[in-house]
Amino acid sequence: MGSEMCIRDSYHIALDMAEEASKGDAKIGTTKNGIGPCYADKVNRIGIRICDLYDMETFKQKLAYNVEFKNKMLTKVYDAEPVNYDEILADYIKYAEALKPYVTDTNNAVLKAIKEDKKVLFEGAQATMLDLDHGTYPFVTSSHPIAGGASTGAGVGPNYLKNIFGVVKAYATRVGAGPFPTEQLNEIGEELRTLGHEFGTVTGRPRRTGWLDLMVVKYAAGLNLSLIHISEPTRP
């Protein structure tokens, strides 16, 4: 676990839920797990990182600032319930001890493995069209789930990414709102959903389903790949 990784907290989740509810019909369809607000803190340079857990005075100062700031937003802007500083602090004192054996300098650990000619695999999640810069903005995630994200996320140079493999479903899916030109709002879509067990891994929501969009595949391949694999749906 990288020491520089930002921590997602209960106030991120509370803000995510409040912000999404306030948008009405303009909802993006987030998982409401606080990912966006956590990334916002990172960009605003007020995020709390794993390494802060091991300097408790620094952690307490950062947590106090964040709780005060987030509670103002929750109560004054969104008319929502505030979060409790003491409860969060008590939780993270326990988390710090439990996580300590797993915290390391992942950048150097990965680079060391590469230089020792060990096999290193970076596995991405989500999809190209959810990329913050290259996806269907604003209906995107907060990070970069493309090949370049492996380099920046792991902290190794792009020259170390020797082979980039892409996996494409034989049909298209989407969770949440956003454009979906080939979506099938009919029996075909239902069959694809049933056949592929297409339900969100976090929310359990039924995924939107439709035909494979080769223009999207071409676009994604240009952004990412040296090899592509199309998965074949099979019946249970």
Predicted features by range, described:
Residues 1-7, 232-235:
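Short, small-residue-biased leader/transition segments that mark boundaries at the very start
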Residues 3-4, 8-109, 113, 120:
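Internal alpha/beta core interface subdomains
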Residues 9-15, 43-45, 131-135, 140-142, ...:
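Short acidic, glycine/serine/threonine-rich loops at helix termini
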Residues 52-59, 135-165:
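Gly/Ser/Thr-rich active-site loops/lids in small-molecule metabolic enzymes
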Residues 65, 69-72, 91, 109-112, ...:
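Alpha-helical scaffold segments in soluble metabolic enzymes
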Residues 99-145, 154:
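Acidic catalytic cores of enzymes that act on phosphate-bearing nucleotides/polynucleotides
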Residues 150-227, 231:
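A glycine- and small/hydrophobic-rich beta-loop-beta segment
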